[in-house]
C-alpha cells in the first residue's frame, strides 16, 4: 500500500498540530514539506475505509513515535518511514494491505538512477534495467503474500528475506554441480522432456569444459545466488590425455573468459560462479573410478590423475594472475582452494595471485569438523555432515533457502518492549523457520507442479536428479553481532565478551540442530553475506531510533551493521587476535562462514601469505577465509597500483579501485552506500 499516494502537497487542513519545532518530510522524488499528522489519518480512511475514530487512533500512535524520534535528534523524515509505520500499525489492528501494486513515476526514476547499486556484480545494461523494473513489481507483489507476522517483523527490520522478487519464480539460492552427471549423460537443455538439441557425453577436454560452462549458465535462471563446480580440477583431469600444455592453457583460458563474458545471470550479469580446486586429491575420490571421455568409467581412480589435476590448478591460477586484456582481474569463477593436507609452500603461484588481486579463497574442511566440503559463492558451505558421503553431501545439491535475523534489531526490540533478548530472538527463529519452510514448499510447487525447472531435476540412469532438493541446506543467517552486544551492554565484539557472542551463536545453533534432527531436513546456521541488507536493516533502525541509538556504523545517511559475527572492521584489534577470535567462532556456523583479512597497501610476499595461511589452517578453527588488499587500475593506460589511489599519476585520470565487498572482489564504484561507508572504515594490516 502506498499510503502517501493520496497525500497531495498543496493540501492544508485546519486543526493540524501546531509545532514550533517542525519536521521536514522528504518524498522519494526529493520534494519536501512540513510533517502534518492529519494527512496520515485522512489517507488511511480513504484507502482502507476504516472509521475515522480508529484512523485517528493509529495517526496519534504514529505521531507520538515520530516526535519521540524528534526529541532524539530527528530533523528529517522519509516518506518510506511513514509508509512502513502505517503498515505496521494497520497490521496490529488486523487490517491487511490490498494485494495490488502502485508504481509511481518517481519509482521508475529512482530505478533509472540506482539500478546498479543493490548488487556489485551488476552493470548498467538494458537487461539490467529490465530486470530491475520487473524485480520492483515482483517484490511489491510478494509482500502482499506474506503472513501478517512476517510482514510486521520485516517492516520493523527484525528479519530479511533475500532476493524477495525472485521468490515468485526462482526460490533457490545456490547450486553446486557434480560434473560427472553431465559427463555421463550429456547436455539436455530442457531436461528429460526431449525438447531442444541434445549433446552426447563429451569426448574431449575442451568439450567437457564447454558443457560445464553451459550447464552452469542454464542453471543460473533457476538460482538466486551462485552456481559452482566441486572438485573441478580432479573431475576434468581424466580428459587431458595426450594434450599439450599450450592446448590445455588455451582451453582453460577460453573457459575463464566465457564464464565472465556470458551475461546469463539475472539482469545480464556475469554468472556468479565458483570452482573448487583441490590441492591434493580428496580422500573420498582416491578409490573412485574416474569418469573419462564419452562418459565411460575408467579403470583408473581419480588419485591416478594427480599430475593432471595439479596442472589444471596451476594454469587457472596463472591465467587469473595475468588478468584480462586490460590487466583487470578475471572475477569469475571465484577460485576456492581446498588446502587440507597440502604443503602450501609448493603453491607459490596461488599466493602470488592472492597478493596481486586478492582472488583466492582458502578452505579447510577439517576446521569445520568434516572430511570434505564444497563451498558455493562466497561462503555457503556443503560439508559432509548430512549423510557422511561427500558424493551426496557436497555436490549435486546446494542451498535452497536462507533468511537473515538482524541481531541489533532483536536487541533494540527487546529493550523497547522491556522483554528478554532471548525470548525475542527465539520468536524470530521460529518465524524464520516457518517462513523458510513455506518458501521451500513454493519451490517444490514451482518445480514439480508447474514444471518451471525441468532442467534442474532431469535424472541420470539411476533416477537421481541433477539437483537433489532433499539434500539441500535450509539456513538461518544473522547480522550485526558486534552491535547487538553493544546494545546489550557488553561493548563491541572483542576477546573480553566473545563468550557472549558464542552464547548467542550456540542458542541459534541449538535450534537449527534440533530442527535438523526432528524434521530430517538439512537445517544450518551461517554468516549471511548481507551485501545490501547490512545497510538496509541498519537504515530501518536509524529511522526508528535515530543514528546514535541504533548503534549503526557509518553515517546517518549511509549506515551499516557489521556482517554476521565479524569483529567490526574499524576495531583496532591486531591481526593475530582477530584471526583467533573469528577462527574460534566459525565452527559454530557450519553452513557457511568467511573471515576477511584486510591487508595494507604494501605488496604482500607470497611466502608470508603461505605461512600465515598454514598457521590459520593448523592452529585455528577458521575453515573459510581470504586475504584482501585494495588495488587501483587506470582505465586509460591500464597501470595497476596497490591501495586506494584516486588518480593515475601518469594519465591524471580517475582510477577504478577494487576490493572485496562481502565475499567477492569487484569495483567499488558499483557498491551501495552502506558498503562504501564500511570500506572507508576498514582497518588494514
Residue ranges and their predicted role:
Residues 234, 474-487, 506, 660:
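Contiguous, well-ordered alpha-helical segments that form the cores/surfaces of helical PPI scaffolds
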